[in-house]
Amino acid sequence: MAFVTNASGNVIAFSDSFDVRDIEQRVFEANEINFTDAASPAFNNLNEYIDNLCEKSMARILLKFKASSWWRTYTGSGPSNLPDLDPDKIKARQQDFTDMSVFYVLKEYILPKAADFGIEESAEVAKIKYYSDKFEDMFQELIAVADWYDKDGDGTVQEGEEMTTFRMTRRTRGKKFVTRIR
């Protein structure tokens, strides 16, 4: 599904409750988690609660990208003045971001409520590890490809906006030889 936007058209979440239920509906059908206790009175139903978790996951994912060395290199900024990623500038691979958000919601918020951490072979503990691994794989893939962010905000991702890296030429001296690294 496409990103969730507010009335102004700004992205507020990469996924919604239907995306989460589509991937892991057994947890909800088997009623393994008493969500009436988990959801605060501020939410009218389970879908609103899950939508709120999806919004939290987007914030955490954007922060993880911002904290990566990839973002520092991509923006050319130092650690003290890093700009935030703008979710409205993500123009490609939106389904990958939706999947990554669902994996994050499941591994961090929903499955830990049902998991029995005392039993290592617990199905829910195994699922947490599974979704955690899938999340990390997708995160690393998005960093490696880096063809999804519209840096200049013109509505398209052009070749010049894709990740470029620069290496400084330096000399390294060993005992018997000199190596030039580019």
Name what the model sees in each region.
Residues M1-Q95, D154, E161-R182:
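Conserved short "hinge" loops at termini or chain/domain junctions
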Residues N52-W148:
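Internal mixed-charge
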